Amino acid sequence: MQFIRNDKLYDTDTAKLIETEYKYFYQPKSYVDKETHHSLYKKSNGEFFLIKEEYERIQRGLYPISKPTIEPLTEEEAKKWAEDNLSTTKYINTFGPISE
């Protein structure tokens, strides 16, 4: 997938996928549940971006609710997302050593 934001190209085929967070939302009294996928990517120039996808989950599978969206992130925003979603090892491999 390719996106342009603020006159910059973001391409999921050339960027490195760091992690995808999956969330499932059960909807009582509904035949359709919801699932979200948030994927953190790092470009070769060090920029980060988050791809957000939403799906309806029914008995026969997942169906997109809308087009995927992109959110360019600063390194600090990417670190905050990573603190909540990455293992310690993956965090250090992505951002480098941290102090104790």
Language-model segments: which ranges?
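Secondary-structure transition motif
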Residues: 1-100
